A protein has these predicted regions:
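Bacterial N-terminal signal peptides
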Residues: 4-15
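Extracellular ligand-binding/catalytic regions of CAZymes and related secreted enzymes
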Residues: 19-35, 50-51, 58-62, 231-333
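Helical hinge/lid and interdomain linker segments adjacent to catalytic or ligand-binding clefts
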Residues: 20-29, 38-40, 44-137
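Catalytic beta-strand/loop cores that center a nucleophilic Ser/Cys/Thr
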Residues: 22, 60, 66, 84-85, ...
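A structural signal for well-ordered alpha-helical segments within the folded catalytic domains
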Residues: 35, 49-53, 87-88, 95, ...
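Hydrophobic/aromatic beta-strand patches that form the interior of the parallel beta-sheet core
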Residues: 38, 68, 128, 222-226, ...
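A glycine-rich, often tryptophan-bearing local segment used as a flexible ligand/cofactor-contacting loop or short
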Residues: 107-198
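Catalytic metal-binding/acid-base residues of hydrolase active sites
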Residues: 126, 133, 229, 273-275
Length: 333
């Protein structure tokens, strides 16, 4: 009898321990009711574990989406560890996801985890990529999914997930890193795009610098926002004179993708997206609107929709190894 009881208890406990590796946020009432968004974090510098947690809470509490946030987890401690590049538990959630939001950097995931991402992409479901997702993966040559690596040159998917799905891979810092912040300027002819409802020049701002992208972007990309390089780290600082803003680099665009002949899916990419970038309401609105658009819900985008932060949000400054130590996903509820 005691043995049976012990077995039953252990069976009951397994799902609880597994679920502790990610965060689930149930949607309230709202246009997104019934839609499932999976947000995949995991970068060493820009605090995607903070940014995507807050974005998920906004999408759930303000807009009704059911959200699951996945993290880089140290398997020895169960703690969020962005420096652990080979473990993001819970990617099975992508099997039933309507949207993937991704903000990873140079991940070396095992084949079993990459298969979940590959299956999702082959289904043609939508993708929203933030900041370092342009160089989301750095997989070893022996990986079955090496073709998703940011710098691989094989004909199968040259420059990997970044270039082939999002529209660009890692190139360089265009603004001076940690010295020149970014102001968002609506691209010429883009003001009528539904993602930009409620967004004007200067509403989007972040302390992260503009990334270099190669111009023109690949065929089919529609630039929505340009990044004005500023002389300092405050929203009101003037723009840098000269070549850095002539022309300005795209920092947000849309496109469609298809993986190896599969169905086409919608993509929104922004090279912004650190947790500190989300301090600006315009940046939060850009991301929320992009999720609606990616899901084909652009008719539900309201210029005055609620993008207020949920709970306490004190983003950490971006820097390598700057994550808050000792935090487990359950601590973020």
């Amino acid at each position: 009898m005691r043995l049976l009881l012990a077995i039953l208890v252990s069976i009951c406990l397994v799902p609880c321990h597994a679920a502790d590796a990610w965060l689930t946020v149930a949607g309230a009432d709202g246009p997104g009711k019934g839609k499932r968004v999976v947000l995949v974090s995991g970068d060493e510098e820009y605090r995607s574990e903070e940014a995507l947690t807050q974005l998920a809470k906004i999408l759930a509490a303000r807009h009704g989406f059911d959200c699951t946030v996945l993290y880089a987890i140290d398997p020895a401690t169960g703690e969020i560890s962005p420096n652990t590049s080979d473990n993001i538990p819970g990617l099975e959630a992508l099997r039933t996801a309507d949207l993937m939001v991704i903000a990873t950097r140079f991940r070396k995931l095992p084949d079993a985890q990459m298969k979940e991402i590959d299956d999702y992409l082959k289904s043609g479901r939508p993708v929203v990529g933030l900041r370092t997702a342009t160089h989301a993966f750095n997989l070893p040559a022996e990986s079955a999914y090496h073709h998703y690596s940011w710098n691989q040159q094989a004909a199968r998917m040259p420059q990997g997930f970044g270039r082939q799905v999002l529209g660009e891979t890692w190139v360089a810092h265009h603004g001076a890193h940690g010295k020149e912040s970014t102001r968002g300027i609506v691209a010429p002819g883009a003001s009528g795009h539904p993602i930009l409802r409620g967004i004007a020049d200067g509403d989007i701002w972040g302390p992260t610098d503009v990334y270099t992208v190669r111009l023109p972007l690949p065929e089919g990309c529609e630039t929505l926002v340009l990044g004005q390089v500023l002389t300092g780290m405050e929203p009101g600082t003037p723009p840098v004179a000269g070549a850095k803003n002539e022309p300005m680099m795209p920092i947000a665009w849309t496109k469609h993708y298809a993986v190896e002949g599969g169905p086409r899916g919608r993509v929104f990419t922004t090279t912004m997206g650190s947790s500190s970038d989300l301090a600006a309401a315009g940046t939060r609105r850009l991301l929320v609107n992009a999720c609606y658009w990616a899901l084909g819900m652009e008719d539900a985008i309201a210029a005055s929709s609620n993008v207020d932060v949920v709970g306490t949000f004190t983003p950490s400054p971006f820097r390598n190894n700057g994550y808050v130590k000792g935090v487990k996903p359950a601590d973020l509820r």
